[in-house]
Regions:
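Cysteine-cluster motifs in flexible loop/terminal segments that predominantly coordinate metals
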Residues: 113-166
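A general marker of short, structured functional hotspots
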Residues: 16, 34, 40, 83, ...
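Amphipathic, charge-rich alpha-helical segments that serve as recognition/docking helices
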Residues: 1-91
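Sequence-pattern detector for short linear motifs
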Residues: 25, 43, 51, 106-108, ...
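Context-gated lysine
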Residues: 21, 37-40, 50, 77, ...
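C-terminal helicase lobe and adjacent C-terminal extensions/tails of nucleic-acid helicase motors
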Residues: 90-114
Length: 167
């Protein structure tokens, strides 16, 4: 049934994300098996899965095509509190500082600058961070593009715990 749903021409990004999530939760599939089955890249499937983490208000805007999949994916990388704040300040009706017409890269930069904690500013051992999915350096398609300063931690609680332990 999942395969049939994903082969429909009118499947929305969130329906696609939900189908991937159901397939994974069924225990019959892994990310790797979905890559093989649907001919999509691992990065593509993981980015679609992030759409399941969107707050309702942003998910509804995505469904109405008021925001793009790329914008929704960038915002979905952040926790619920950040998403709610971003929605209220930049995507809600009547907001004063709308980001609705900004390009994806610009939104990603704004989110990073405002809500991300750069790993290179901390001195604790970052060995675990090198493979952590909360490390933004592990979320980019071409790792060669990641030079100094692009590794950011999206899990502030974990990062603060590591820093406290170091200190």
């Amino acid at each position: 049934a999942i395969t049939e749903n994903l082969q429909r021409e009118d499947v929305t990004p969130r329906e696609e994300a939900a189908a991937y999530k159901r397939a994974l939760e069924s225990g019959r599939h892994t990310i790797e098996s979905l890559v093989g089955k649907f001919g999509k890249s691992e990065t593509y499937i993981r980015s679609r899965l992030k759409l399941c983490d969107l707050i309702d208000a942003l998910a509804e805007q995505l469904d109405r095509e008021e925001i793009s999949v790329g914008v929704a994916t960038e915002i979905a990388k952040y926790n619920v509190e950040v998403q709610q704040e971003v929605y209220e300040e930049h995507f809600s009706d009547g907001c004063r500082l709308s980001w609705k017409n900004a390009r994806i890269k610009e939104i990603a930069r704004r989110l990073y600058d405002r809500y991300m904690t750069r790993l290179d500013t901390y001195r604790f051992d970052k060995t675990e961070c090198h493979t952590c999915h909360h490390n933004t350096a592990n979320q980019i398609l071409f790792k060669d593009e990641c030079t100094d300063g692009c590794a950011g931690c999206q899990n502030r609680n974990c990062m603060m715990r590591k820093n406290d332990e170091y200190l």
